[in-house]
Amino acid sequence: MVYENPDGVRIGLEIHIQLNKLKTKMFCGCSTDYHNAAPNTHTCPICLGLPGTLPVLNKKAVEAAIKVGLALEGEIAEETQFHRKNYFYPDLPKGFQITQYDFPIVSNGKVVIEGEDGEHTVGITRAHMEEDPGKLVHIGSIEKSKGVLIDYNRSGVPLIETVTEPDMRSPKEARRFLDKFRNILEYLDVFDGNLEGAMRVDANVSVHWGTRVEVKNISSHKGVEKALLYEIMRQKNVIRRGGKVSQETRHFDEGRGVTLSMRTKEEAEDYRYFREPDLMPMRITGWIPSIKKTLPELPDAKRARFIEQYGITDMHAKSLTSKIMLADFYESVCAKGVDPKIAATWTADVFLGELNYRDLEISSYDGKKIGFIHAKDPGIKNSIKASDMVELINLFAEGKISDRAAVEVIRTMLDAAEEKTPSQIIEEKGLFKAEDDLVTKAIAETIAENEAAVQDYIGGTEKSLNFLVGQVMKKTKGTADAKTARELIIKELKG
């Protein structure tokens, strides 16, 4: 199937990624670990832009940028240099931002995503290094704020800005690109996406192959999808009414789900770029071979290996490699002798499904425990041991607990305030599989109490059988094996 794109939608993204796994800022020795710090405590004369200070380049930031470029299959520049981007804004104490202009460190890369009609390649125009500005805290909403506070803790944190080609044709494709891109960055261990402000996106969008509009500074993948859905609808409505779409910059109000005009093309600033005189150009071709050797197995390669090595489905492999910590957790479970296909089902379908239902995000894996935190409330967090998942899967595989009981154990482990093993939870909740005579008794009672459903099933209504199985599971408090109960009911009613 070929995706027709009837509305002529073109989407390109500019993604600002904090290299927040680095310990120090881009041009000074201040810590990048500022998220729980008091405002303006992770600063120094350099990142505050005080007169007489000179920047000192963080070599590890350059190495991280090269890693990102290699992972994106991009061209790494033989020589690169920094420029000054001149503009006045309160979050930029120097009056200019140190960035890269016409000599980016990476160009001509690509990311392959699942598009509307199969695999789809999104081109990477460039990726360049720069420093993050400070953070403005608006008192109240951004439109009605009567005052602004400035926190310079973020000022100078290393950034990579990645610019894509306008190759995405729907908001869904844009979100899939961001999910894939974030996954690659986390595999490289240069980026923690769970931290506030770690990834900020500017989205450029046009319809009917027309005028481009930029939506600035969107902070989440879901927000990007929502902003694009609204903006595409707005532009189509303008054209439908006989108007023309203006080339402008807009802001996305996430609370209201709308985009609002910030400035038109005529108001756009000239940044007067010129070469940063305090930093020499860099020749980095000699760094590339050694950095290439440090690249980890990336998501697509790991996914292919999981399918071949463990014999699991492509769908399970995609889910399990969507987070490197989840992939490592799964491999730890398999390494302890668990059937990889059963482990994939319980990890990708049940465990990950329960995390998503609770709005929990995987945050860590130390080789023993996988940790997770609430997406909106970092104070809500917990962890599960790989050894506990192994124990649970083995109990299920040995037929000692039903699938429903196993799900109940996972839910309890996710919600529990104190750590307990699966066996302890099963014992406390009475979840060990019911004895055969108990199941037989429950089936007999169910048949006797539900004559209408019995007659419906005998008459050919298949869903009535599901109802009867549910009643048996209810009577046995989920300890019966649903498949066995189903077979016994059929045998009883149809011989």
UniProtKB/Swiss-Prot annotation:
Entry-linked SUPFAM superfamilies: GatB/YqeY motif, Glutamine synthetase/guanido kinase
MF GO annotations: asparaginyl-tRNA synthase (glutamine-hydrolyzing) activity; ATP binding; glutaminyl-tRNA synthase (glutamine-hydrolyzing) activity
Keywords tagged on the record: ATP-binding, Ligase, Nucleotide-binding, Protein biosynthesis
Keyword Ligase tagged: yes
Keyword ATP-binding among UniProt keywords: yes
Catalysed transformations (reactions): L-glutamyl-tRNA(Gln) + L-glutamine + ATP + H2O = L-glutaminyl-tRNA(Gln) + L-glutamate + ADP + phosphate + H(+); L-aspartyl-tRNA(Asn) + L-glutamine + ATP + H2O = L-asparaginyl-tRNA(Asn) + L-glutamate + ADP + phosphate + 2 H(+)
InterPro entries linked to this entry: Asn/Gln-tRNA_amidoTrfase_suB/E (IPR017959), Asn/Gln-tRNA_Trfase_suB/E_cat (IPR006075), Asn/Gln_amidotransferase (IPR018027), Asn/Gln_tRNA_amidoTrase-B-like (IPR003789), GatB (IPR004413), GatB_C_1 (IPR042114), GatB_Yqey_C_2 (IPR023168), Gln-tRNA_amidoTrfase_suB_CS (IPR017958)
Pfam families: GatB_N, GatB_Yqey
Top-level taxonomic group: Archaea
Entry EC no(s): 6.3.5.-
EC class name: ligase
GO biological process: glutaminyl-tRNAGln biosynthesis via transamidation; translation
Subunit-level organization: Heterotrimer of A, B and C subunits.
Reported function: Allows the formation of correctly charged Asn-tRNA(Asn) or Gln-tRNA(Gln) through the transamidation of misacylated Asp-tRNA(Asn) or Glu-tRNA(Gln) in organisms which lack either or both of asparaginyl-tRNA or glutaminyl-tRNA synthetases. The reaction takes place in the presence of glutamine and ATP through an activated phospho-Asp-tRNA(Asn) or phospho-Glu-tRNA(Gln).
Family as reported in the entry's similarity comment: Belongs to the GatB/GatE family. GatB subfamily.
NCBIfam families xrefs: gatB, PRK05477.1-2, PRK05477.1-4
Protein name: Aspartyl/glutamyl-tRNA(Asn/Gln) amidotransferase subunit B
Gene source species: Methanosarcina barkeri (strain Fusaro / DSM 804)
Gene: gatB
